[in-house]
Amino acid sequence: MLCRAVCSASRRLAPALGILGVRQKHSLPDLPYDYGALQPHINAEIMQLHHSKHHAAYLNNLNIAEEKYQEALAKGDVTAQVALQPALKFNGGGHINHSIFWTNLSPNGGGEPKGELLEAIKRDFGSFDKFKEKLTAVSVGVQGSGWGWLGFNKERGCLQIAACSNQDPLQGTTGLIPLLGIDVWEHAYYLQLKNVRPDYLKAIWKVIKNS
């Protein structure tokens, strides 16, 4: 199951990582469930705004930045290419991170995973509860905006927990293959839970995909 999880993560990344290949317009991925499907844990208004407004904004700004970057490349304008890097990183990361995030959630989520992934979690963290506690602490502890992640370290062959600031993508920042991402930007929970991030973590574990 761990192999399937890693391979699945790579497939999820492929469309979003088009920023590294041939220039093409990126499109907003459809959610595999309705906006209201995660209620009462995450309400429909948050899901709609998060997906159709916030993710869409990263996507649109990424397309604009890439178009400008291609123009700068064609002109040989190195100064403009360098100046566009922050926008490409921020908006590209926002698109990649959210594309993964949506697939990590499920109306039928919550509880322990099964098979090889659970065994790997027990091996690397002691138990599922210890893993959950550690990822929760790392996610709650992110200063400002960012993400908490479970990733796979290909070199060491083990699972690792990491945090990334803002929209920095996990693989581009740490080299870890992202398996599970928790968005701790306030737009992910403020309308429902105000600024109480720990309550958001309690809620989101109830809809995190377990298969």
Curated annotation (Swiss-Prot):
Keywords: Acetylation, Manganese, Metal-binding, Mitochondrion, Nitration, Oxidoreductase, Transit peptide, Ubl conjugation. One of its GO terms (biological process) is regulation of transcription by RNA polymerase II. One of its GO terms (molecular function) is superoxide dismutase activity. InterPro entries: Fe/Mn_Superoxide_Dismutase, Mn/Fe_SOD, Mn/Fe_SOD_BS, Mn/Fe_SOD_C, Mn/Fe_SOD_N, Mn/Fe_SOD_N_sf, SOD_C_sf. Nitrated under oxidative stress. Nitration coupled with oxidation inhibits the catalytic activity. Its EC number is 1.15.1.1. Residues 1-24 form a transit peptide. It is an enzyme of class 1 (oxidoreductase). Belongs to the iron/manganese superoxide dismutase family. Destroys superoxide anion radicals which are normally produced within the cells and which are toxic to biological systems. This is Superoxide dismutase [Mn], mitochondrial.
